[in-house]
Every structure is written in C-alpha cells, then in structure tokens.
Design a protein with these regions (language model features):
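Alpha-helical transmembrane-bundle signature of multi-pass membrane transport and export proteins
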Residues: 1-398
Length: 398
C-alpha cells in the first residue's frame, strides 16, 4: 500500500513521471549494499534475530512516512530518504526469511512453500494497491499511510513465532572475506546465476508501474482509481497463479519452466504496451475523474497485467526453488541477499528505464521492453543449455 501511495504523492507534488521513477532508483545502491550485508548477517547469526531487528526498522520508517503526510511537509527529498530506509530494511528481512525456509521444510516441499509464500505476498499486494488507490481518492495520503502502519504491526507476529535459526556450521563474520566467498560460489554456479540474470532482464524492460500515475492522469484517465486497479490487476494474476500452483510441484525441468514463464511475461507486457500506445495515439483522456468511458482501455490493460503477474509469479516460484535447493545452507543467506537485491532492485532499474523513455518523448516503453524480454530470454536459454536441463530431482548449482 505504501509503495503505491508514495508514488501517487510524489506525482501529486511534482507532476513528473521521472520524479516518481526516482522513488525507487535513489534507494537502489543502499538496497544493494543492504542485501549483500544482510545476507552475510543471515549466514553468520541467528536468522530470526536478523529478521526481527530489520522488521522494527521497516515499521519505524513506515510510521515516519505517515508522520510526514500528517504534518503536510510535501518534501520529496524526505520521502526519498524514508523510502530508502524502508527498502534497506525490507531487503534484509527478505534475505533472512527466505534463508530460513529450507531449514523448515525439505527440498521436495520447496515448490509448495514458495507457492504458499507467493499466495501470501499476492494477497497483500492485491489488496494493498487497490485499497491504497481508493483510500487516497477518498481520504488522502495521511490516513492511507496510517492504515499501512497499523497493518504492518501484524507482521511482527510471524517473525516472533519463528524458532531460533543459528548457523549450522562456523561461518565467516560479515565482511569482505564472506562476500568474496559468496561471489566465488555464485561465479561457479551457472544455474543459480541464470535465475538472477533472467529476472534482471524481465524487471528492467518489463516494469511499467512508474507509468501508472501518468496513465491514470493523461492516457486512460481515472486518476488514483486507475493506478490502484492496474497495480491490483498485476497482483491478482500473481495471486491466482499461486492459488492454482499445485501442478508446479511436479515440474522437473524447472530451468526450462523459468524460461517459458518469463517469455509469457514479456508477451503480456508487450500487449499492455500496445493498449497504452493505442490510447495515447488516439489522443488520451486527460482526466483524473473515473468514468465508464475509460473501462474498455482499463479492462484491456488490467487483463494484460494480470497475465504478466501470473507469469512472473510462476517464474518466481521456480527461481526461488532452484536457489534454495541448489545452494548449501551456509551460502543461502548471502545468495538470498543477492536474490532480494535482484527482485527488488530490478524493478527500480525498470522504473528508470521507463521514466527515461517517457522523458525522451516516447509512450511505448512496455511494448519495446516486452519484445526485448522475449528475444533476450531465447538467446540466453540457447547459450546456457545446462539451465534448460536443470532437474529438480537432482539439484545442481552448475
């Protein structure tokens, strides 16, 4: 909810899609450092403690964003800082929590665990953006942030009830030696590296969220309601694919499945780009008031984004399973740190890509990006045949 609301608030203050894109871009470098260091912390210390401390940090930053809105400061710089702190904390939480999962379940249950996690995440991001858009339209930014602060408090329960997760073996203390050890392992592990590279491609060229405020204000119309609907459509697709993910546990060629899922994702993003470009060429609808006249374009955009969300979730389930099954426990924290950096940092690079393309005068970044995704995935799967042949029954990092 907060991520959507911050984007709307920055757009309200600046009326600039590029400034909205900077919400994610500015936090990218700190988040990369946090992911790397947080992963080392998860390998060296009790993973439950690392997750709990990070959750407190994330809650405090969310509360400060709400305070900023209540005080009416309208400071884009302060919003950038607070969102960066929140992203840093979230990266460390993700690294430590994901490294915990293989210690709780066996390899045969990892796809099911990943799918269950995707259902939980999908539900939160489905309800969050939709409710966020409606609350902003009805009550404004401050009450919307406050609701998120209250809901975020419930997240502590899941972390507190986890068992202690001390390292199974002696681990290097966080520092350069630990980082180098993880980097060397990753360099030798082509299959794990491919999960990162493919996701970077998908998120860099296929992340249209930074365009949503402008689409709602200038192209499709509908303002914050449209932004919430588009954000929710993506999440609904992810949620539904998680709910019906039972057959994924029987897929052995998981690397090949990742390739197909990301290819479908690229096609869906390209279709979304076609609808947006067509609406733009037809003159757009410069209105932030929701009306039935925008429903055809909004429905087509939402359908494409729902397919994209579903495909992205399937890809995420398999990529996460490959990483957790093929990596030794002593490396999982560091590799999960890199994984979280990729899955959260990639969209921020995608925000910059979309913002720059629009700033250059083009309205078609999703269309161009979707085609690039399809082409690059096909090329990489041909260049790395071991990834296509990856067998879930015989996990192999190489």
């Amino acid at each position: 909810m907060t991520s959507v609301t911050v984007g709307l608030e920055v757009y309200e203050i600046t009326r600039s899609t590029f400034m909205v894109s900077l919400v994610g871009v500015i936090s990218l470098v700190p988040m990369i450092l946090a992911g790397l260091y947080g992963g080392m912390l998860a390998d060296a210390f009790d993973r439950r403690t690392v997750a709990l401390v990070s959750a407190v940090m994330a809650w405090v930053s969310t509360a400060m964003i709400a305070a900023h809105a209540w005080l009416g400061l309208d400071s884009v710089v302060l919003l950038y800082v607070l969102v960066t702190v929140n992203a840093v904390a979230g990266t460390v939480i993700g690294a430590s929590r994901a490294a915990i999962v293989p210690r709780l379940v066996g390899n045969d249950l990892l796809p099911a665990a990943s799918a269950l996690n995707s259902i939980s995440a999908g539900f939160s991001v489905t309800v969050g953006p939709a409710v966020g858009g409606v609350l902003v339209a009805a009550f404004g930014f401050a009450p919307t942030y406050t609701v998120d602060v209250v809901l975020f408090s419930a997240a502590f329960l899941g972390v507190v009830t986890l068992p202690r997760m001390a390292p199974e073996h002696d681990a290097l203390r966080p520092g350069l030696s630990s980082l180098v050890e993880g980097a060397r392992f990753l360099r030798r592990s082509r299959n794990i590296t491919m999960t990162f590279v493919l996701d970077i491609i998908a998120m860099t060229f296929g992340q249209p969220r930074v365009l949503f405020p402008a689409i709602g204000a200038l192209v499709v119309g509908g303002g914050s309601i449209t932004v919430g609907a588009l954000s929710a459509a993506y999440a609904v697709g992810a949620l539904l694919s998680g709910v019906f993910s039972g057959p994924l546990g029987h897929v052995r060629r998981q690397g090949e499945a990742v390739g197909w899922a990301i290819t479908v994702y690229g096609g869906a993003i390209a279709a979304f780009g076609v609808v947006v470009a067509a609406a733009h060429l037809l003159g757009g609808r410069a209105s932030e008031t929701f009306s039935t006249g925008i429903l055809p374009a909004l429905a087509l955009c939402a359908l494409a984004l729902a397919v994209a969300g579903g495909a992205d979730n399937v890809s995420s389930v398999f990529r996460g399973t490959i990483l957790q099954a093929a990596a030794p426990d002593g490396m999982r924290g560091r590799l999960q740190g890199i994984f979280i950096v990729v899955v959260t940092g990639g969209p921020r690079v995608g925000d910059l890509y979309a913002g720059l393309v629009v700033a250059a005068g083009f309205a078609w970044p999703p269309l161009i990006g979707g085609v690039l995704i399809i082409a690059l995935v096909a090329l990489l799967l041909r260049l790395v045949p071991s990834f296509r042949r990856y067998d879930a029954l015989h996990p192999n990092a190489n």
